[in-house]
């Protein structure tokens, strides 16, 4: 993985390909490359280790021409980051780019070596190039050669193949890794993310599992896994064309932190009235399904898992329905027991997270009453394969460290919890109104919280030279502490851990000293007094405390305990609200340290491999 772009056009496509890669930089990568062929079958391949700009400079210098091409940004999975491991890979006249992991690549490599093929790279992708080259010797067309090749592959792939001897077409295959086709006028495109193509088209088609497509300037022909030609829906995208522009902000992450009030308003629009949740707006047949739910199983990864952990408290406290939350990569390999009338909920910003998708597909075989997804990308695999989808409307999120996707997931989950309790008669009209009013107030409250930016920036200097940080919370604020620790480690590279505050005495207290910052999330709720006792445990051992506390919480600071006073907000939405200062803290610590905030090392935005 990480990003794919392709084009078949009458005009030169090198600039389109490179611009597409720029738009996919947010996904994370270590190298980039293009292969372009002209009408005379002259092929140019250029690969570079490092940023897309280095590739762009090389393409400009080489004056690359040609109307058919493929391009790729790589995030290393097999083989170290290097120019020789960068895509496109070649075998004779065949060029290939690929996202995913070919699990049987070692067996295929041995087979191909026995046929006389010599491998130049350490990647699993090169086996695809050699297999296509081999199959093309006897196949009637490139399409047939690719169809024969993919039947030999085990694992996940979104792969695009170009034959220099047939510059009029490219062939793409998809299994477990997303591919979207863009339709132009006398030209067609493909990518792993529609954002790459928004500057050239607004009409898109998503390939389904097992599809193989042949793309020319005039036509897109799609074939399913059985080889039958099929039609796939073409839809107009309303995604923002300029989503890749930072505007006045220094980083995309900063921009996206500030976009949260608007993202929340958009997510709530049409789903809540002045005093109630509109259950029908949650999804097709949502009211009927929710009325029967006896158990909720949430499956997610990373930040989305933390959102699910927060919502578990809401499902049980507000709706009175038991809820389990599991990391997708663990869920799919566990021999779990499906409870009666259990609703599966997957959470994902991209809708393409490989482990979450695999968990959904497994769950469909295990007797869940329905599968729902809460997702930010319309047309993504999770949305298409779930029984119903609740879209978060956060807008395109570029920064690898998720911000607005997290808070909009929480808002969506709170609306879902309220609808569930309402359908089952477990919450009163008064309680529903209280929740809805708290949600309506939230965007304005978050706008106010963003005004603390300068204070938090000053606070961040205390963390920049530290190697470890501890985050503490209780109840639904324990997952908020988990999310805060994840953000800090992701973008500042400071080792950070989160604990339920009551667990301090069971081990983490051994870590406390004057060099260990301890961040405490302390709203005013029925666990506050317990939390104060935990704070005193740290204080008694010389720990350095930073307490984000409700104005009514009654904390008093001193030289070892700094109090960051937060305005009082509803207990119902406080978990969402307290996320904002945690995001700002992580951002400014990373800024002071000089790390790559938007593209932290070793990480990718959409994890489409296991």
Swiss-Prot record:
Biological process terms in GO annotation: carbohydrate metabolic process; fructose 6-phosphate metabolic process; protein N-linked glycosylation; UDP-N-acetylglucosamine metabolic process
Annotated keywords: Aminotransferase, Cytoplasm, Glutamine amidotransferase, Repeat, Transferase
Name of the protein in question: Glutamine--fructose-6-phosphate aminotransferase [isomerizing]
Source organism (scientific name): Vibrio vulnificus (strain CMCP6)
Chain segments annotated as coiled-coil in the UniProt record: none
One Gene Ontology MF term: glutamine-fructose-6-phosphate transaminase (isomerizing) activity
UniProt-annotated location(s): Cytoplasm
Active-site annotation: 2, 605
GO cellular component: cytosol
Family annotation (InterPro entries): GATase_2_dom, GFAT, GFAT_N, GlmS/AgaS_SIS, GlmS/FrlB_SIS, Ntn_hydrolases_N, SIS_dom, SIS_dom_sf
Oligomeric and partner information: Homodimer.
Pfam family, one: SIS
Function, in words: Catalyzes the first step in hexosamine metabolism, converting fructose-6P into glucosamine-6P using glutamine as a nitrogen source.
Residue ranges of domain SIS in the record: 286-426, 459-600
Domain Glutamine amidotransferase type-2, first and last residues per copy: 2-218
């Amino acid at each position: 993985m990480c990003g794919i772009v392709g084009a078949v056009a009458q005009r030169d496509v090198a600039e389109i390909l490179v611009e597409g890669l720029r738009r996919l930089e947010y996904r994370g990568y270590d190298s980039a490359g293009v292969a372009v062929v002209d009408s005379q079958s002259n092929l140019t391949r250029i690969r570079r280790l490092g940023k897309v700009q280095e590739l762009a400079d090389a393409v400009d210098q080489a004056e690359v021409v040609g109307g058919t091409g493929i391009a790729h940004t790589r995030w290393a999975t097999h083989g170290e980051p290097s120019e020789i491991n960068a895509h496109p890979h070649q075998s004779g006249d065949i060029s290939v780019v690929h996202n995913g992991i070919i699990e049987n690549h070692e067996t295929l490599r041995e087979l191909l070596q026995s046929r006389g093929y010599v491998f130049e790279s350490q990647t699993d992708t090169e086996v695809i190039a050699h297999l296509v080259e081999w199959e093309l010797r006897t196949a009637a067309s490139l399409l047939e050669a690719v169809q024969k090749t993919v039947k030999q592959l085990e694992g996940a792939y979104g792969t695009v193949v170009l034959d220099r001897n047939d510059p009029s077409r490219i062939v793409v295959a998809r299994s477990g890794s997303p591919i979207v086709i863009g339709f132009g006028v006398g030209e067609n495109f493909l990518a792993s993310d529609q954002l790459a193509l928004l500057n050239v088209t607004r009409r898109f088609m998503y390939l389904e599992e097992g599809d193989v497509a042949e793309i020319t300037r005039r036509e897109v022909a799609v074939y399913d896994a059985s080889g039958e030609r099929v039609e796939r829906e073409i839809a107009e995208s309303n995604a923002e064309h300029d989503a890749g522009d930072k505007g006045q902000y220094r980083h995309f992450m900063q921009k996206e932190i500030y976009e949260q009030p608007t993202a929340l308003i958009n997510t709530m629009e049409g789903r809540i009235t002045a005093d109630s949740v509109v259950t029908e707006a949650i999804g097709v047949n949502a009211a009927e399904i929710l009325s029967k739910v006896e158990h909720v199983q949430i499956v997610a990864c990373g930040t989305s898992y933390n959102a699910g952990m927060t919502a578990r408290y809401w499902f049980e406290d507000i709706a009175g329905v038991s809820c389990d939350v599991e990391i997708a990569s663990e869920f799919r390999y566990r021999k779990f027991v499906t409870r009666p009338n259990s609703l599966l909920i997957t959470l994902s910003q991209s809708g393409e997270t490989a482990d979450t998708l695999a968990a959904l597909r497994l769950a469909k075989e295990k007797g869940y009453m329905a599968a729902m997804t809460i997702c930010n990308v319309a047309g993504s695999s999770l949305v298409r394969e779930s029984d119903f989808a609740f879209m978060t409307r956060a807008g395109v999120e570029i920064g690898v460290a998720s911000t607005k996707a997290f808070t909009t997931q929480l808002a969506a989950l709170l609306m879902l919890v309220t609808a569930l309790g309402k359908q089952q008669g477990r919450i009163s009209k008064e309680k529903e109104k209280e929740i809805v009013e708290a949600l309506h107030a939230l965007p304005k409250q978050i706008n106010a919280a963003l005004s603390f930016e300068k204070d938090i920036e000053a606070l961040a200097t205390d963390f920049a030279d530290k190697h470890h940080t501890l985050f503490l919370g209780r109840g639904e604020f324990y997952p908020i502490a988990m999310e805060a620790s994840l953000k800090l480690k992701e973008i500042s590279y400071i080792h950070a851990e989160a604990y339920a505050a009551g667990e301090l005495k069971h081990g983490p207290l051994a870590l406390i000293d004057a060099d260990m910052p301890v961040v405490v999330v302390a709203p005013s709720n029925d666990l506050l007094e317990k939390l104060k006792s935990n704070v005193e445990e740290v204080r008694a051992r010389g720990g350095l405390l930073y307490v984000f506390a409700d104005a009514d919480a009654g904390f008093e600071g001193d030289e070892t305990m700094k109090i960051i006073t937060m305005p009082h907000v509803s207990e119902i939405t406080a978990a969402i609200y307290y996320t904002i200062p945690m995001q700002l803290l992580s951002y400014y610590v990373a800024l002071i340290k000089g790390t790559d905030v938007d593209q932290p090392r070793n990480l990718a935005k959409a994890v489409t491999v296991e």
